[in-house]
Amino acid sequence: DLVRSRGLGDVYKRQGELSSLSEWDSIRLDNLGIKTIIDLRTNQETLTAPIKYTKANILQIPISVGKIADAPQRVIEGRMRKGDAGVYMEDEYLQFVTDNTDQFAKVLEQFQNEDNYPILISCSYGKDRTGFLTAMLLAALDIPRDAIMEDYLTSNQYIDTSHLADIVKHLSTDAQESITVFLTANEGLMDLAFHKIKKEYGSTEKYLSKGLRLTD
């Protein structure tokens, strides 16, 4: 579902993947006048489930997700041990800072041209890659950290897992718990990313200016 982030008005929306849009979903995008869709999914993800909406300029800027790319298959095959999911998620959020800063900077370049507005950012569930990017946008607007976190956690109100019901009921308890971890926006993960930013750059402000190349 579409999420409107605090402080960004009608310039920017975030959402999970757009490969299975209903007719109603397409109408909503039409009504919003979305001009640019930035897809943060990996090449493999977009090949498997391409975006079919044709009324906006679609840019693919893939953000790598580390070990978590193999997680769904590991869960289904029963190879996900208790506690693995949390480690995988931590690895993903750390890699946002260590391995994907240039890619996130490319995304933010699109906001420098108002002809691209409104912009919709999309990934698999609209909470991790998109959630981190949104947090950086809000930080650049001097939104307080607690408000940034509140915005990030709103993802939990919109993630629809109904399509997984038939699969999940046949899985082990460990596998079911892993899926819950993967599909939950967790305050600790975003805190981990901010701590990594401080360690690598000294402050969020320096990360925004030196890493993400944002200027006043």
Listing of model-derived features with the role each one plays in the protein:
Residues 1, 34, 143:
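Short phosphate-binding/catalytic loops that engage adenosine nucleotides
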Residues 1-12:
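Single conserved hydrophobic/aromatic residue that forms the stacking wall/gate
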Residues 15-115:
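Cysteine-based protein phosphatase catalytic domain of the PTP/DSP
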Residues 49, 132-133:
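A short acidic (Asp/Glu
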Residues 103-115, 133-216:
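PTP/DSP superfamily signal
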Residues 116-120:
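Residue-level preference for the first positions of well-ordered beta-strands
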Residues 125, 129-130:
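Ser/Thr-glycine-rich phosphate-binding loops at phosphate-binding pockets of nucleotides
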